[in-house]
Amino acid sequence: MSVKRFNPDINVGLNVEEVTKRYESNLVNFDPSSKTKSFKQIILENVFTLFNIINIILSIAIILVGSYKNLAFMIIIILNTLISIIQEYRSKKTLDKLKIISEAKVKVRREGVDNKLNLNEIVLDDIIILETGNQVVVDTVIKSGEAEVDESFITGESETIYKKTGDMILSGSFIVSGNVIGQVEHIGNDNYTSKIVNDTKYIKAVSSEIMNALNKIVSTISMLIVPIAILLFYRQLYLEDSNITNAVVNTVAALIGMIPEGLVLLTSTVLAVSVIKLSRRNVLVHDLYCIETLARVDVVCLDKTGTITEGCMEVVEEKKESNKNIGSIIAKICTALNEENPTAKALKEYYHSELLDEEIIKNISFSSKRKYSGIVTNKKTYVMGAPEFILKEKIDKYRNKIDKYTKEYRVICVCEADNAKLENVHVLGFVLLRDKIRPEAPATLNYFKEQGVTIKIISGDNPNTVLNIAKRAGMKEDIEMIDATTLKTDEDIMNAVERYTVFGRVTPEQKKEIVIALQNHGHTVAMTGDGVNDVLALKEADCSIAMSTGSDATKNVSQLVLLDSNFSSMPEIVKEGRRTINNIERSASLFLVKTVYASILALLFIFIKMPYPFIPIQLTLASVSTIGIPSFILSFEPNNERVTGKFLPNVLKKAVPPAITIVINILIIIIISSILKLTYTQTSTLSVLMTGYTSFILLFKVCQPFNMMRKCLFGSMFLLFVFGIVKLKTIFSFSSFTLPMIFTTILCIITSHYFYNLIEHILKKSLENAKKMQEEKRKTLLKQI
């Protein structure tokens, strides 16, 4: 549908009637990138998960039969949900505060009066006034004036662009110098930045080994749980001396044992603690699981601005070609023009000496066309800028010097001339500038190198400039660079990402393609960014990191936000991630033992004509002493080793031997119980005892190498378990020990060690053979290629 456009006088702007019509037609600007989840959305998404729904159904079953003491497992579910809600809400509040702080007001002219309006109050065809230093919030056509515009936020290119009457200034850019009056051309989704953001509306699944493993376990169990529940309940109900209460309690005991609710809580808790630690280092974490992803990262893609450099220039040296004080001349020019581009700021910071004592007649503003700026005084004309544009044919005299300087620096030529036409121009000297490297950048880059993490620098700037910056920041001398304009196809990008370290003149779309290509090569990729031009790549990356000084769109799509925009936080984030994930992986084996043996037992007891050997409250003792407390304490130990391998295979390798051993023990106990005519309470007591004992064998292995803390942990947990068996019999429904029970216990202890070691040995050999076969297959494929 075509929209009727207004053409207001730039000195008057829209009138009240025209503005009202725009509001009625909903032609009002809004920022689609700035919305965060509502509190209601956060609650609903965290409460109604498949994991929670399964446990709620089981708890309802327990409540219906009145066995309230067996509801202890729901405490874990509630805690886990609360942690997730609180963490996500904290992130939302911090983001909303950042938005309020960074939200710019816009000077809008209506009915001849200039007022500062919010972003969402601007309407189509409004007349807006843009001055030096302003951010452009909507696509605007210049109606009067001219300006130098910095579009690096949206394109990555640091060179300013000259804009004049009739030109379009894109939203997301900044006015570096000059003042213009413009008319709003696009609003809302039609703005350039909004179109980029809209390309990222799909939700990319979080690349988390732990989350994927937990989801895989829960989804598998959810498919099995209904048929198992029906069959097991039927079997338990029609046993001799059984009733509906016993059948429900026994069935729920089997089913909750299959669900690793403790592992979910441990993971959420430990990650939440990591989030709190990182917040003290000014790091905002959106997604708990991105800490794990960052711990697994082997490639980090950086933009030079805001990470390696501070986003500003610095004067390095002054090369005089005359006796004149060029500092006073530069200071005079900078004061007169009051430009805000990075070069002008660096010159003003360096040259704050006494100004040139001459009267200014005319200012010569910088433009990308003339490439210099200056002043005309009552005595001379003084200019500074690009040597080739000032000297023209006279440049040959200084060619060797300039070529030497430009290898490492941006060269500003300072000259005097007789008039503004630069007649009889004389070189007074050269000022050498360069991008200011962050003091912490070399140490940060060196840390990643030592940790085996590859760095890729992706920028919209000239590749030679970016390469020099990379080398100054301490990257190795033999790194290679490429101009991304030469990468025409996906195949070109696939080949380039493995060979080159520095990518220059990269478009926003190419940044995304580079990230995808690295992932296709099997890498786990982290991406840092601050501009709208980084949004597409940030959404594709396995772990996305934004600077707080960046756009709202960038901060909202990123999993981590560096609140002080300090890249030196990265090593600490990685260390925290590695400590957290390594320890969760180690502790997870304790939890998955229960999931494995409970799943096998649930299937077996569909066919075995005996009551399920546990009730929920009994499993609580074994779980707390061999899993809950030990895993929680072990998860906070220091551990900076790089995370390798797949989470689930790594964990199952440790969990399967004790789980199968527990199943064998329980089968032995059932057989002996049938022969010796032991009661159900005696059978369940023996089952809990041997389940706990076998779990302690695994805990012993997990605690190695022992230190004082681990010795105390293991000893105290063993005593707690024994105390529960002996002194808390009534609470946990245990029986006193008889001679047949003692005999059965001794037999099971012996068989536990035998079967544990046997299964561990078989599993180890099987994995080694599988690894060899995989390696041989890989070699065969390479030979064929």
PLM region spans:
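Transmembrane helix-loop-helix hairpins at the membrane interface
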Residues: N29-K107, L347
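Cytosolic catalytic regions of P-type ion-transporting ATPases
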Residues: V3-K4, G13-V16, E103-N212, R410, ...
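Membrane-embedded transport module
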Residues: L232, E477-A526, A541, S548-R710, ...
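Cytosolic catalytic headpieces and adjacent flexible linkers of membrane translocases
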Residues: I230, Y234-L237, S373-D396, I402-A517, ...
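Actuator/coupling domain of P-type ATPases
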Residues: N7-K35, L79-L82, I86, R90-K93, ...
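Cytosolic catalytic regions of ATP/NTP-dependent phosphoryl-transfer enzymes
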Residues: R296-V427, L433, N446-Y447, I455-L467, ...
